[in-house]
Amino acid sequence: MSAPSDHGLTPSSPAPQSCSPTPASASSPSHTVSDQPAAQAGRPLRVVYAGTPVFAAQALDALIGSRHKVVAVLSQPDRPAGRGQKLLPSAVKQRALAANLPVLQPESLRIRPAAADETEERRVRREAANQGAEEALAALRALQPDVMVVAAYGLLLPQSVLDLPRLGCLNIHASLLPRWRGAAPIQRAIEAGDAETGVCIMQMEAGLDTGPVGARHVVPILETDTASILHDRLADVGAKAIVAALDDLSAGRLV
């Protein structure tokens, strides 16, 4: 398999790999995630999935196994890791390639203007990043997704991307928003001594975790929980929750 560019579609390979929910409020519903599938109605949705770490890989697995169709995956560019500092793919990219899904890895999805004091080196880097963003946006438009699902992707999405899917973008966030917006919500909940946390499925806006919440799934934090143990439990809840949310969305129940 030829090596993928950081901004193009990675060819399929046998190698390893919003809608308008109800606004968040004190009365936002909390749900218990069931192993039983939601009542199915409406056609399967075309999904673009954006995520990077292990937490996001579990939800991708659930979507691949659902009745909905994942048409492409966005993940951050391969990063150097280990003693040899070899470039390694993200957990999400590995899952995507194992499922023969195309992968996009732009450094950014924002088109950045030139700065007044821009050096030649920065100009070259900016133009390369802008080209990657333009190619990724063109590929996403061509896919005509119904919805984008985002989980710990690590890049902010500009409004042009949020507006691209027919039904908008849904985010899987591992906290009971608005508490612990942003990065590392699992660790922050444990460090603060919270008695409970959870997973929110929310409509994405241009701000950081500021969109309206469609579903809240409460998870108690046990005395024996470490960040790793709680991470795995929340990843399982998030995976089930997003499949249920897409079933509701396709049936017109998530409005």
Per-segment meaning from a language model:
Residues M1-V255:
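One-carbon transfer enzymes
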